[in-house]
Every structure is written in structure tokens, then in C-alpha cells.
Amino acid sequence: MGCRLLCCAVLCLLGAVPMETGVTQTPRHLVMGMTNKKSLKCEQHLGHNAMYWYKQSAKKPLELMFVYNFKEQTENNSVPSRFSPECPNSSHLFLHLHTLQPEDSALYLCASSQ
């Protein structure tokens, strides 16, 4: 099987907690090929200043990818450039995905805090 035929599945578990928590993530599930470009959206209505993206790979601990505080990126744990966050305002944080690799198959989660 050639590399061109290999697809990378990015799965997002969304809505795992009740909607009244004030943090939502869309789309609920995302499957994409290695050449596609897609985005995940995180939205919070809690008035929090900080927002986060996490990655949970199979049989690995939860990994912090990006931290934004007051719309400014304060942490990036050497995340590959094929993942690019965007924080247009204090209640939205996007994770743009492109040219994914097989090792990118994971559960991606967002969160917010004071």
C-alpha cells in the first residue's frame, strides 16, 4: 500500500460533557486524508481568559499542544507546523490541520480556564 493511499484519521470526541459547561468543540468527528486542510473550532462562553488545545494519542498520556492567555499564545510544546492555532478573540480558538501524518491520528480536545 503506497503512502498516497494512506489516510490519516483525526477523531474528535466532542460533547462528552453536558453543553451547560460553556465550552463546545466542532465538528464532533473529523476524518481527513493527509493532503486535506480542515479546522477544529473551540468556543467558550464562560468569560475565561485562557484556552487550550490537547492531543490524546492511543496509549499515550494527554499532551498539551497550545495555550492562549488573553488571545496571546503563551506555550507551544514543539508542536509540528502542520498544526496551527488561531485565536481571533477571547471566546474562540481554532486548530487548523494540514498535511497530517499517520502519527497525528488522535483525540483532540479543547478547554478553557480563568
UniProtKB/Swiss-Prot annotation:
Taxonomic lineage of the native organism: Eukaryota, Metazoa, Chordata, Craniata, Vertebrata
Keywords: Adaptive immunity, Cell membrane, Disulfide bond, Glycoprotein, Immunity, Immunoglobulin domain, Membrane, Receptor, Signal, T cell receptor
Record's protein name: T cell receptor beta variable 4-2
SMART domains (alphabetical): IGv (SM00406)
Subunit structure, interactors included: Alpha-beta TR is a heterodimer composed of an alpha and beta chain; disulfide-linked. The alpha-beta TR is associated with the transmembrane signaling CD3 coreceptor proteins to form the TR-CD3 (TcR or TCR). The assembly of alpha-beta TR heterodimers with CD3 occurs in the endoplasmic reticulum where a single alpha-beta TR heterodimer associates with one CD3D-CD3E heterodimer, one CD3G-CD3E heterodimer and one CD247 homodimer forming a stable octameric structure. CD3D-CD3E and CD3G-CD3E heterodimers preferentially associate with TR alpha and TR beta chains, respectively.
Taxonomy, superkingdom: Eukaryota
Organism: Homo sapiens (Human)
Pfam families hit by this protein: V-set (PF07686)
Any GO BP annotation: adaptive immune response
Disulphide linkage map: 42-110
